[in-house]
Amino acid sequence: MLYRKAQVSDRWLRAPLQAPTALHQPLSYISRSHIADVFASQENGRKDISVCFTGHRAIPPQELPALTERRDRVLEALYQHGFRDFICGGALGFDTLAAQRILLMRTHHADVRLRLAIPCSTQSARWKASDCLIYEQLLYAADETVVLSSHYYEGCMYMRNRYMVDNSAFCVCYLNRQKGGTMYTALYAMQEGLPLLNLAIASDCERLIQGTKV
């Protein structure tokens, strides 16, 4: 498992409950001021085979069965199109749903890689214990984890979203509300020229699965 290493303060180390245990083994903090320099040369080589995911935290129960089926079929189609790296933000809801399926894909496609882009090490500080447990499991299982800040600050989620888009060649979203972080990320992806597939639109998913452009 690859982690990005840097030093953090003793104060942060003395507060293990503020960040998941996985982020302390080893430390995986990098300041946002160094993101471009550190990652440009290392990630560009895989950008062409990378897909990022963005979606709402709250998923209506009645939409979950159809969304799950589309997720599974779209991920397999993306693999057949040559994509191998899948970048998720590690948040609740759609992010977790995507990451869990990617890990399952890895059991029968050995070259699949799950890359987590975490906005801050304290992302899960106020989550329920059950959600934190799932988050820890994802952190340990991921092939690569990038933590963009040691602490929360206003705008860190948007920084994470831009990082994912900047290191991808395709964006998959679950978007049914015209506001919030998912909408921002989808607009940014389109601005940067990435193909965008919305899992909330069944016809677009079917076109990709059938091998035609979205």
PLM regions and their residue ranges:
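Short intrinsically disordered terminal tails
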Residues: 1, 211-214
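Extreme N-terminal basic, low-complexity initiation segments
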Residues: 3-6
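N-terminal polybasic/positive-inside topogenic patches
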Residues: 9, 13-24
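Acidic/glycine-enriched connector segments
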Residues: 29-211
